[in-house]
Amino acid sequence: MATVGAPRHFCRCACFCTDNLYVARYGLHVRFRGEQQLRRDYGPILRSRGCVSAKDFQQLLAELEQEVERRQRLGQESAARKALIASSYHPARPEVYDSLQDAALAPEFLAVTEYSVSPDADLKGLLQRLETVSEEKRIYRVPVFTAPFCQALLEELEHFEQSDMPKGRPNTMNNYGVLLHELGLDEPLMTPLRERFLQPLMALLYPDCGGGRLDSHRAFVVKYAPGQDLELGCHYDNAELTLNVALGKVFTGGALYFGGLFQAPTALTEPLEVEHVVGQGVLHRGGQLHGARPLGTGERWNLVVWLRASAVRNSLCPMCCREPDLVDDEGFGDGFTREEPATVDVCALT
């Protein structure tokens, strides 16, 4: 299922440096173009959430300006980290950097993929081979990795975490984790996982979301532990589709919760909670509002793969809901391309 043709150049949308800036203290994503705009657009809700004094607001302004500067430097700094890691880091479990083998994958996942590429495969038959977490929300679960592979990957991630190598934040909300492309795991692990296994599966589950046109991804591991990140606020992903796999370790709490699609006015009415099962992956639409409940005890590590289809996002950026203003970027960027493949309709509200 690999994409054939010349290498493609990927971009991000310019809104990355202005929109969806997360303020954890107030549990709010904001668009930031300056002090007056921030006061005008968010003054009442900020005051209702505790930003009441002049000092509070000035502290918020400083944090937002710092975050914008961080995002502006992100591509260059990420490339520098990746180069240093490639030249200087010594893995503890070098076998996880080998090309993805079937032995790393759960038998159920291999069976689901084998069915997905069979001539007579259809959605009804596929759903008999998956756990449907929510038919209404189109959330599914399937074992992805074997227990030995999860353990080996975790050991490698912990070894890297404890090394003196530079580390980038996994995303704009989490502070602890690992960017897999910086560690050198995109080419051997994540790209084959997307191309060979996830694309045929997603093509049947989510054809209206570009499931059959996935051409890039962003993969990272997030870590939750006492004294570090404990929970994750409600958000939606910069992705058409998402795979979230629990890697371990031993923990309590931290369940995922899901609302509706972010465009819906009652998107967080009666959220659905989903417990983690080590080795199993939860599949959902990127636009599905979700978060993570507070960790109780232990450490929780999850692999998150944002799956992207330029045929969808080239016409509408999911983060600013406008036609993307393209900016050249490193690697897969945020999944946009300057060339125009045939587009598909974005996910409908269901």
Curated annotation (Swiss-Prot):
Q: Does the keyword Isomerase apply?
A: no
Cited Pfam families: OGFOD2-like (PF25238)
Q: Which residues form the Fe2OG dioxygenase domain?
A: 215-309
Task: Give the EC class as a word.
Answer: oxidoreductase
Q: What is this protein called?
A: 2-oxoglutarate and iron-dependent oxygenase domain-containing protein 2
Q: Which GO terms describe its molecular function?
A: dioxygenase activity; iron ion binding; L-ascorbic acid binding; oxidoreductase activity, acting on paired donors, with incorporation or reduction of molecular oxygen
The gene coding this protein: OGFOD2
Kindly list the positions annotated as binding 2-oxoglutarate.
300
